[in-house]
Amino acid sequence: DRILLWLQPSPSAEETGVSCTIETASDRDYLHVAALDRIAWPIAPDLFIPDGEHIWRIWCDMATLLVARRPGGSDSLSESGDIAGALVMFPTNASELCLHKIMVHPECRGSGIGTQLMQAGLAQANTPVLLTVDPSNNAAVALYQNFGFDVRERIDGYYRPHEHRLIMVHPGPS
C-alpha cells in the first residue's frame, strides 16, 4: 500500500521536540478523528475510502480508539483540532484484535507519533493483534516485523482481484 509508506521508523519525541499524550478517545473526539481520516491519506484517494463520522462515533464506544493529543489547545492542527494521530483496533470473531488503522496528521509525520500509537495499542491488547498489508509494501512489512508482527498468510484478491494482502499477526501479551 502506498498509503502506508509514511509509517517508517521515526525519531522519538525527545529527538524532535514534539510531544503528544496518547489516550483513549472520547465521544467528543470522533469528528476530529474522522477529519484526520480524510486528510491522512491524500496520496491514494482512488484506493482509499475514509470511514464516515458515524463509524468513528461507534468506535469511540465499541473499539480501542487511541488518539495522540498534541499540546496547544483544540485548534492547533488544521481540521483535526489537537489530534495529531489515531489508532483503531476492534475485536474479531477469532478472539483477536484487528488493527484497522494508524494515521498521523501530515503536519506531524516523522515525529514518532505513529510509533507511540503502535506501542500504546499493543500494550493495551490482551489478545493477538492482526493487520493486513500489501505484500509489495516492503517498508511497511519490515516496520510491522520490527514491532513483532509475523506473516500468517497471503491472500490473493483480498479486496479486489488485483489487491493482495498479507495477514500479519502480533502474538499479544506474553
Feature map (PLM): residue ranges:
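Short hydrophobic/aromatic beta-strand or adjacent loop that forms the aromatic wall/cage
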Residues: 1-4, 63-65, 163-167
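Conserved beta-strand-loop-alpha-helix junction that forms the acyl-donor binding cleft
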Residues: 106, 131-141, 157-162
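Conserved GNAT acetyl-CoA-binding A-motif
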Residues: 118, 124-136
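Acetyl-CoA-dependent GNAT
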Residues: 6, 20, 24-109, 115-120, ...
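Conserved active-site tyrosine of GNAT-family acetyltransferases
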Residues: 1, 144, 149
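Conserved N-terminal entry element of GNAT/NAT acetyltransferase domains
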Residues: 2-28, 170, 174
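Residue-level detector of beta-propeller blades
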Residues: 83, 151-154
